[in-house]
Amino acid sequence: MLISIEGNIATGKSTHFEYIKTLQLDKVYFVDEPVEEWRNIKDKNNMNALECFYNDKKNSFCFQVLAYITRLKKLIDIIKQYPNDIIMSERCIESDKYVFAKMLYESGDISSIEWETYNYWYNCFSEISKVDLIIYISTDPVECLKRVKSRNRNEETSIPLEYLEQCHNKHEEWLNSSSIPVIKIDGQQSIENIRLEINKIMQRLVEPNSLVASRTKPISTAI
């Protein structure tokens, strides 16, 4: 069963994803977002792929293809290794497409032929890494921007509030129209309250009689 942790940039995904790892639940395995892979690919000026994307939108298609390939490879590798267990990923290829790639296509940063090419690749492999449940951490874009500035990552210095607002809206649009079950968590609660919610969710998922014993559709909680 594949569960994806979703949310805007700086919504708290990575923090809570790392917390779930500390619970050391039996037969639960993790797929980190492939950020290090993106940072290891650099241009002739030593700018990594993520920096190139944020600094020049002409690199949009290139980066989205890289994000898709690196994420898909990690997912396929772990699904093959643990086909009957719970796999948790930080984002998925669905959010790559329906949030980030779609947003770039609608803004004109990805051309129509690039969008059609992306969709062809997506459709070829979407069934392999199909998500069974989404845990969505929803945080106001203004708060996300504060967190972006606070963590001060080189690649994110040029991210404006408008981009975070667009990301937020695209997440809401995607998840409200998706057939994938969604559990929504308010990302602006205290970290203690969020962890209490996560603990309850994870305990339900690992119960012996839970539907998650196989990769079938589990708990259905709409946002």
PLM feature spans:
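Hydrophobic anchor at the beta1->P-loop junction of P-loop NTPases
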Residues: 5
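P-loop (Walker A) phosphate-binding loop of NTP-binding proteins
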Residues: 8
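Conserved lysine of the Walker
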Residues: 13
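NTP-dependent small-molecule kinase module
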Residues: 145-223
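Hydrophobic positions on the alpha1 helix immediately C-terminal to the Walker A/P-loop
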Residues: 16, 20
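Glycine-rich phosphate-binding loop used to anchor ATP phosphates in small-molecule kinases
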Residues: 58-129
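Conserved substrate/cofactor phosphate-moiety recognition/catalytic segment
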Residues: 22-65, 70
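A glycine- and Lys/Arg-enriched "phosphate-lid" helix/loop adjacent to the NTP-binding pocket
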Residues: 97-169
